[in-house]
């Protein structure tokens, strides 16, 4: 595999700003590893962060890389982020899904249109855009051509980037970590249904 992805899957009706918070925490973990991350909207309710891998990386190694990053985020920010697969156990937390890297799993590709009520497009972002604040509804089939003309193919650097150092993540995961806390979030009603992001 040439890249891996971390899928941020929020419960229904959670403000998208909270998804952006988790994306920033993923970026922090990647920065510790000197690994580049490329965010994009899913075109629906979630966000994907892609990380280039060395050419020929086995699926198992890519999956382990994402599992370590996702677990670090969930451990440091347990009030908002989780790697819990059970929807009932997640509550109002955002699922940091690394299992989409299992062979045969699929994600909406960059620039793909989605069948939803706002005609969303899965759109690559810069980190500056993410930091400034965006929503999935900002990127639709109606304004996609205009955006491409303005910013070009933001996904091109992913295809050219040097792959992440897989040895670095193994060392990082073994080192002692300081657990953080997330302020201002509370678990409320349990999400009752699953949805594709």
Placement of each model-derived feature along the sequence:
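Catalytic palm subdomain of template-directed nucleic-acid polymerases
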Residues: 50-62
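Short, conserved phosphate-binding/catalytic loop or strand-edge motifs used
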Residues: 41-51
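Active-site glycine- and acidic-residue-rich loops that bind
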Residues: 20
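Nucleic-acid 5′ end/cap handling module spanning
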Residues: 17, 40, 53-55
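Active-site palm subdomain of RNA-directed nucleic acid polymerases
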Residues: 27-41
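C-terminal accessory nucleic-acid interaction domains of nucleic acid-metabolism proteins
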Residues: 1-5, 9-16, 25, 32-33, ...
């Amino acid at each position: 595999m040439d890249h891996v992805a971390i899928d941020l899957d929020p419960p229904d009706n959670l403000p998208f700003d909270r998804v952006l918070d988790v994306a920033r925490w993923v970026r922090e973990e990647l920065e510790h590893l000197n690994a580049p991350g490329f965010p994009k909207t899913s075109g629906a309710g979630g966000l994907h962060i892609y990380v280039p891998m060395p050419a020929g990386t086995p699926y198992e190694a890519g999956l382990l890389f994402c599992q370590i990053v996702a677990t670090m985020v969930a451990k440091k920010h347990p009030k908002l982020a989780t790697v819990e697969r059970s929807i009932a156990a997640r509550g109002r937390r955002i699922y940091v899904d690394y299992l989409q890297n299992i062979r045969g799993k699929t994600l909406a590709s960059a620039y793909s249109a989605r069948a939803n009520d706002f005609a969303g497009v899965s759109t690559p972002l810069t980190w500056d855009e993410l930091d400034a604040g965006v929503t999935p509804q900002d990127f639709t089939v109606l304004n996609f051509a205009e955006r491409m003309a303005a910013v070009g193919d933001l996904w091109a650097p992913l295809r050219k980037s040097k792959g992440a150092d897989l040895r670095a993540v193994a060392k990082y995961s073994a080192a002692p970590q300081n657990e953080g806390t997330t302020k201002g979030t509370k678990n409320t009603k349990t999400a009752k249904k699953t949805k594709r992001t």
